[in-house]
Amino acid sequence: MGLPIVPGLLLSLVLLALLMGIHPSGVTGLVPSLGDREKRDNLCPQGKYAHPKNNSICCTKCHKGTYLVSDCPSPGQETVCEVCDKGTFTASQNHVRQCLSCKTCRKEMFQVEISPCKADMDTVCGCKKNQFQRYLSETHFQCVDCSPCFNGTVTIPCKEKQNTVCNCHAGFFLSGNECTPCSHCKKNQECMKLCLPPVANVTNPQDSGTAVLLPLVIFLGLCLLFFICISLLCRYPQWRPRVYSIICRDSAPVKEVEGEGIVTKPLTPASIPAFSPNPGFNPTLGFSTTPRFSHPVSSTPISPVFGPSNWHNFVPPVREVVPTQGADPLLYGSLNPVPIPAPVRKWEDVVAAQPQRLDTADPAMLYAVVDGVPPTRWKEFMRLLGLSEHEIERLELQNGRCLREAHYSMLEAWRRRTPRHEATLDVVGRVLCDMNLRGCLENIRETLESPAHSSTTHLPR
């Protein structure tokens, strides 16, 4: 028995066969393919498209933000376009019949709207600060927080489409762009390689020790240098005024120090021995010829004045030596006094043997030195005496109207700043000799030896 033939089914099969036969030509003609449309558009210049019904006509495309309503009816006529409705857009020139729908930022993907949708631009979605876009497909992405790189350092900071690149510290390994402790590493070969102790860590303690020791060594060196300087200043006190003048640019005030074993005081009539031409005269003590000692007896009245005018007549006194009982007779040839003649001493020799102090109570002595030194050589004279340049200029400005008073102030300042055993006429004489001013030295000597000066001035010893 055969299957019954249904007339309706047979008709359907015949129609299907006819459609398959005409598909390559008829269907293609009814619905033009995309390639054919592009070929026809290429026949027109840029910014225009071919009329869908008449290829010889090129119509102007619609601007972005608009869509095509009707094609141009003939060459030279404009295409009819309208602006896209709200929620739709076209981002470029087109001849589409309908605008595209705007996309919406997906909150479930933690997206945020960067800029809203406009007629000529689609909605722009992005991520919040400290987040990056992790794409799940070509168009869909999810916002993920950037890695803070705990237990590591940031190699590359977080960007819009890239997470932070971290470099983990020793004892941690990178897992999912996070630094995980090596204690969580079990049997992962990659993990075990990353958790090996680096060789460079062995030298780190040495580097840190050097960083600590270097400042300590510098500090101890400075302390040692300071201690040495203090010790030298204590060992050599004469350096203190010079160091003071170098640091402060001024002369240090020097206290008047009496020389060891030397007491200088003004001469008085009671303390000045008298002089006599008698060769047997004893200026200090008179001794009897008996073996026993007797009280000293003055033989002549004492001269009331002793000044530079008497220096050329100065003769050392002669003493009588009386042997004591039981003394060796070889030491004493005669009991009679034997005078010892002495040569006449020069003024310079007397000054060198007995340095004379420049006394401020006697301004005439200072003025004698001021008037004896040429003004053109005065600054050189004071520099050689040891007065600082700053002090010289200060006193010169202070007494600018009177040059003589300025020179007197400089000499007085030198006398006050110089120790007592150094501020002597001997020092002044040596400086003048070094300056080849022996004539000036003689003038000063004559001034000090003059009767007018001797009658009012007593040089201290």
UniProtKB/Swiss-Prot annotation:
Question: Where does it primarily localize?
Answer: membrane
The organism's superkingdom is given as: Eukaryota
Provide the protein's localization: Cell membrane; Golgi apparatus membrane
Disulfide pattern: C44-C58, C59-C72, C62-C81, C84-C99, C102-C117, C105-C125, C127-C143, C146-C158, C149-C166, C168-C179, C182-C195, C185-C191
Ranges in the topological domain labelled Cytoplasmic: 235-461
UniProt-recorded name of the protein: Tumor necrosis factor receptor superfamily member 1A
Q: Its quaternary structure?
A: Binding of TNF to the extracellular domain leads to homotrimerization. The aggregated death domains provide a novel molecular interface that interacts specifically with the death domain of TRADD. Various TRADD-interacting proteins such as TRAFS, RIPK1 and possibly FADD, are recruited to the complex by their association with TRADD. This complex activates at least two distinct signaling cascades, apoptosis and NF-kappa-B signaling. Interacts with BAG4, BABAM2, FEM1B, GRB2, SQSTM1 and TRPC4AP. Interacts with DAB2IP. Interacts directly with NOL3 (via CARD domain); inhibits TNF-signaling pathway.
Topological domains, Extracellular? 30-211
Q: Which organism is it from?
A: Rattus norvegicus
Q: According to the UniProt entry, where is the signal peptide?
A: 1-29
Chain spans, region N-SMase activation domain (NSD): 344-354
The Gene Ontology biological process annotation of the record reads: aortic valve development; cell surface receptor signaling pathway; cell surface receptor signaling pathway via JAK-STAT; cellular response to estradiol stimulus; cellular response to mechanical stimulus; cytokine-mediated signaling pathway; defense response; defense response to bacterium
As for membrane topology, the entry says: Single-pass type I membrane protein
SMART domains given in the database record: DEATH, TNFR
Q: Which residues are glycosylated?
A: N54, N151, N201
Q: Which Pfam families match?
A: Death (PF00531), TNFR_c6 (PF00020)
What changing I230V does, per the record, is: In strain: LEW/NHsd, ACI/SegHsd, DA/Bkl and F344/NHsd
User: What are the ranges of the TNFR-Cys repeats?
Assistant: 43-82, 83-125, 126-166, 167-196
Q: Where is the Death domain?
A: 363-448
A GO molecular function annotation here is: protease binding
Q: Which keywords are on file for this protein?
A: Apoptosis, Cell membrane, Disulfide bond, Glycoprotein, Golgi apparatus, Membrane, Receptor, Repeat, Signal, Transmembrane, Transmembrane helix
What is the role of the protein in this entry? Receptor for TNFSF2/TNF-alpha and homotrimeric TNFSF1/lymphotoxin-alpha. The adapter molecule FADD recruits caspase-8 to the activated receptor. The resulting death-inducing signaling complex (DISC) performs caspase-8 proteolytic activation which initiates the subsequent cascade of caspases (aspartate-specific cysteine proteases) mediating apoptosis.
